[in-house]
Amino acid sequence: ILKLIGKHFSEETPLPCTAECADVKACTNYGIPSAEPFDTTLSKRNHQANCVIGALAPSLYQDRERLATVLLCNILGGPASNSILNSVLREKNGWVYGVECGYTQFSDTGLVAISLGCDKSNLDKCLTAIDKEIAKLQNEPLSDRKLKAAKKQLLGQLAISSDNGETQCLSMGKGLLAYGKVS
């Protein structure tokens, strides 16, 4: 295994991107490169609609924006049942089987994705409600109390996940690949 890893990640083989190459000011839209929007629908013979809504997000090296995005995704559709989308789409209206918002960080960009599963007849209502909740977050800042509670909840989730050995190993591996050190 070490021989195989060394073949791809030796000192002579530079990583594809480093913190220095992620120049936020060189990009537009807060460092997020632009991309053409698309909408693809695949028809399957079932009663359920599975939908993913995505957007480009800050890269691994954009610390301030990255941390804010982690918190935003947790507030919007994190694992807790009190996330905004879970409250509106599942608890209040019963439109979805499940909904979540996730953030994946790469060396040169990132991806925020909201995914949901619902009955096909509820999909348009769900998309409208998601747009409404995102617009609300854009136009009405969270109260200090709600923001403090969201930060506290995220810290609690991170503390619980840090008890998992696999999570610790993945985190150390990411740190080693991205920054050349384990912290």
PLM feature spans:
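Conserved phosphate-interacting/catalytic interface
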Residues: 80
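Flexible glycine/proline-enriched surface loops and loop-helix/loop-strand junctions
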Residues: 34-35, 67-69
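A generic local secondary-structure boundary/capping motif
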Residues: 28-31, 39-43
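Charge-rich, well-structured scaffold segments of protease-associated domains
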Residues: 1-23, 41, 46-51, 57-60, ...
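Active-site palm subdomain of RNA-directed nucleic acid polymerases
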Residues: 84, 89
